[in-house]
Structures are given as structure tokens and as C-alpha cells.
């Protein structure tokens, strides 16, 4: 948990500094009009959507009103399941990863999250589930190790979410100890214990492996932000230039 908060603080600082360097007023306007949703990684335990903060612990989803930032107010606590790991916002939905399934909640009523469905991978029995989504597809990394309850496969799972009430796993890719993930345009970035994997998702349900970026680092999570990829590693935060989305170029490392 200590490393999660360190990443959150460093990411906030980096994103703020990147935003301050933007001189194009249209870019600034687009950022400001992004629904008030905070930037966060796929392994986060909290996210901000509009005027609400959503957090998860091992079993529950909690909703806080941020109408008064000085005094957040707990509005609701919703039982989700067991061994909850991550939370990720997508439009008016929350994707909540656990060691057994991905839960999908509607936040059409932001103070009363409603469970819509669950997504289960037939490939592994127990795992850690960072998850992201866009349009009609969701991607989850399913990591099987002692921390996540054992199992036999670590994979990148691809879900068809066109019917949000009945998500279906379309395909998967075998990986070695995957962690967080993020996407920019038609590229998907997956943090792993052995490097940063880059995939083309031009065909969204069929990720095509492009390359692995190895910097002698154990990658935990990534946040694409414009033409910059913010990567959280075991030894600090690395910034990559992703002007060429399929070929991240090292910029600097923040210890």
C-alpha cells in the first residue's frame, strides 16, 4: 500500500507538471472538460468520477461526496465480494477487479452503485485483476502466484463488453507475471515483472505483440498521458515518450 500512495503522489506531480507545460489552449480545455475524472492507474484502489471519490477495500466499495473538498462525506458502502484488488472508471461504469472475477457496476446514480454483471476468465481459477476498458472491449491482466492465491496461468484476457450485462472473454495472451496496464490510441501497454510489453490493438479483440521494453526494472503500472507514458517500477517512476505509440522512448527516471 505504501508503494501505491507513492505512485499516486508522484503521478499527480508529474501530470500537473506536464499539464503546466501545455501551451495549446485547446489541449487545456479538453483536459479541464474531462468530466472531472482523476488520472489513475489500473492497479489503483481509488478513483474520482465527477464530484465523487470511489474507494475499495478487500470487500467493499465506498462512495464519498467531494462537494466540499475539505470535508469528504461518506455517502454509501456497497458490499462487492471478497479479495477486491482494483477499481477503474469507464464512462458511467466502474470495473472492480478481485482475485476471482471482475465486477461491473453502474454509477448512473453516483451515490448508489448498482452491480450489473461479472466477468470470469475460464483460464485461471484465482488471480489478481487489474482491468481497463474502452468502447466495447475490456482488458485484464490475470496474475497467478502465491500472493494471488496460486493458479496455473498468468494472462492478458480480452473481454467483449458490448452486452455489459453479459461480458464474454474473447481471447487471451500468455504473460509472465503481468501487473497494471493502459492504452493510448491503438496500442496497449502491459507492465510485467520482466519489462513493459507493447501490443497493437488496432484489432481490439486480438492484441498483437510488438515489443518488450527492458530497463532492468520490474514494472507495476502505467498511465498514458498525451504523448507521455508514466510507468511505475520497483525502483521509481520512468517517463517514456510515446509520440510513436508503438515504440516508447525513454525520457527520464524519477527515483
Question: Where are the model-predicted features located?
Answer:
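Bacterial Sec-dependent N-terminal signal peptides
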Residues: 1-31
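Feature marking well-ordered beta-strand scaffolds used for ligand recognition
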Residues: 20-255
Amino acid at each position: 500500500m505504501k508503494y501505491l500512495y507513492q505512485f499516486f503522489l508522484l503521478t499527480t506531480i508529474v501530470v500537473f507538471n506536464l499539464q503546466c507545460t501545455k501551451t495549446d489552449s485547446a489541449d487545456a480545455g479538453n483536459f479541464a472538460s474531462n468530466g472531472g475524472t482523476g488520472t489513475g492507474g489500473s492497479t489503483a484502489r481509488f478513483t474520482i468520477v465527477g464530484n465523487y471519490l470511489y474507494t475499495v477495500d478487500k470487500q467493499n466499495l465506498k462512495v464519498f461526496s467531494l462537494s466540499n473538498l475539505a470535508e469528504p462525506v461518506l455517502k454509501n458502502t456497497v458490499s462487492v465480494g471478497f479479495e477486491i484488488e482494483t477499481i477503474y472508471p469507464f464512462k458511467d461504469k466502474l470495473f472492480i477487479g478481485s482475485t476471482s472475477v471482475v465486477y461491473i457496476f453502474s454509477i448512473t446514480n453516483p451515490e448508489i452503485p448498482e452491480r450489473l454483471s461479472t466477468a470470469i476468465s475460464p483460464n485461471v481459477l484465482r488471480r489478481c485483476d487489474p482491468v481497463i476498458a474502452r468502447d466495447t472491449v475490456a482488458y485484464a491482466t490475470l496474475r497467478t502466484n502465491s500472493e494471488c492465491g496460486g493458479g496455473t496461468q498468468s494472462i492478458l484476457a480480452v473481454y467483449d463488453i458490448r452486452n455489459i450485462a453479459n461480458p464474454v472473454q474473447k481471447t487471451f495472451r500468455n504473460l509472465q507475471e503481468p501487473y497494471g496496464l493502459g492504452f493510448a490510441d491503438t496500442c496497449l501497454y502491459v507492465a510485467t515483472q520482466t519489462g513493459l510489453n507493447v501490443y497493437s490493438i488496432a484489432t481490439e479483440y486480438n492484441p498483437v505483440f510488438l515489443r518488450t521494453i527492458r530497463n532492468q526494472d520490474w514494472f507495476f503500472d502505467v498511465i498514458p498521458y498525451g504523448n507521455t507514458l508514466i510507468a511505475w517500477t520497483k525502483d521509481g517512476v520512468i517517463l517514456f515518450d510515446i509520440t510513436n505509440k508503438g515504440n516508447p522512448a525513454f525520457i527520464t527516471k524519477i527515483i
